Amino acid sequence: MSFFQYKNYIEEGDLVLAYISRSTIKPINVKKGEIFNTRYGHFEHDKMIGMKYGEQMPGAKGYGFIHLLHPTPELWTLSLPHRTQIVYSPDSSYIIQRLNVKPGSRVIEAGTGSASFTHSFARTVTLSGKVFTYEFHEPRYLEAKKELEEHKLDNTTITHRDVCNDGFSIDNESIEGDVVFLDLPSPWDAIPHLDSVISTSKAAGICCFSPCIEQVDRTVRALEENGWTEIEIVEVAAKRWSARKEMVRSVADAVQRIREIQNGRKTGLEVMKKGPSEEPPAKLQKTDNGYKTPKKSTKVKEGDENYTWLNATKSESEIKSHTSYLTFACKIPKQ
């Protein structure tokens, strides 16, 4: 299974992302004989084999369904097993654009964590580039190494290292990084070690991902002391926008609605004046099994051609809460 190329059909051993709902995406490693269980039904791996990526798969018992999606770094971010707090797409996409990460870039990442952002870097630099990622926590390092190998991210080298104390150098490897991303509790301790591994032929860009403003203060001082310039702090605030159609109402519709409301109020007042009654309302028909409730009004499907519609958008009422401060800087090599 590769994150670099798309394929049409699912095969045994492939990674499939099961889209259950907007907030629930689950990774599946397809194996013959296994079953994926959800509250919406169960889904046999055997039947996934040969299906197209993007297809809707019905449940084995005829109810419920999931969509079988091809993995991308963005979808993987929403579905991966979290070992640490991760960098989500609103931040990661801005960082990649701001640092001008492109095919052929050489990226230094410290703080692999769940390897979410590592996937985005690897996909962006392509096989012509290189990602060097470092993780000091051994269990997280081993899990991330296993995932990167399974996903065939051959342009990525992961190293078990505390870069704050031991630096970034790798034996028999010329790193020459032109992009640096530090997701560390104390990036100011790692910054002095960068001079030996960043590019000596072109400018290098850096982004430090820090939740607290106190961390930003110390990071900025370390950047200035080590010759980094054009320092800027950014906070990304994202809101989700939804698109839908609103039915256009005529004046006659509005007048009719007002009449219905007025009649409803009048009827309600009359019932209140009469006081409680043991008899059910006249419009309820008695049957052998009790009283028959009135039918619900007909629901109009959005976009129905028998009505006039207007395209509309709506944003979330509140901006998502703070994730982290992004501290950017660049360093030009000495001539």
UniProtKB/Swiss-Prot annotation:
Main location: nucleus
BP terms from Gene Ontology: tRNA methylation
Location(s), subcellular: Nucleus
Species the sequence originates in: Candida albicans (strain SC5314 / ATCC MYA-2876)
Top-level enzyme category: transferase
Annotated protein name in UniProt: tRNA (adenine(58)-N(1))-methyltransferase catalytic subunit TRM61
Family per similarity comment: Belongs to the class I-like SAM-binding methyltransferase superfamily. TRM61 family.
Function of the protein: Catalytic subunit of tRNA (adenine-N(1)-)-methyltransferase, which catalyzes the formation of N(1)-methyladenine at position 58 (m1A58) in initiator methionyl-tRNA.
GO CC field: nucleus; tRNA (m1A) methyltransferase complex
GO molecular function: tRNA (adenine(58)-N1)-methyltransferase activity
Keyword Mitochondrion (UniProt): no
Region of interest (Disordered), ranges: 271-302
Reactions it catalyzes: adenosine(58) in tRNA + S-adenosyl-L-methionine = N(1)-methyladenosine(58) in tRNA + S-adenosyl-L-homocysteine + H(+)
Binding-site residues for S-adenosyl-L-methionine, renumbered to this chain: 114-116, 135, 140, 162-163, 183
Quaternary data: Heterotetramer; composed of two copies of TRM6 and two copies of TRM61.
Keywords: Methyltransferase, Nucleus, S-adenosyl-L-methionine, Transferase, tRNA processing
Family annotation (InterPro entries): SAM-dependent_MTases_sf (IPR029063), TRM61_C (IPR049470), tRNA_MeTrfase_Gcd14 (IPR014816)
Enzyme Commission designation: 2.1.1.220
Domain of life (superkingdom): Eukaryota
Family annotation (PROSITE patterns): SAM_TRM61
Gene that this sequence comes from: TRM61
Biased amino acid composition, Basic and acidic residues: 271-281
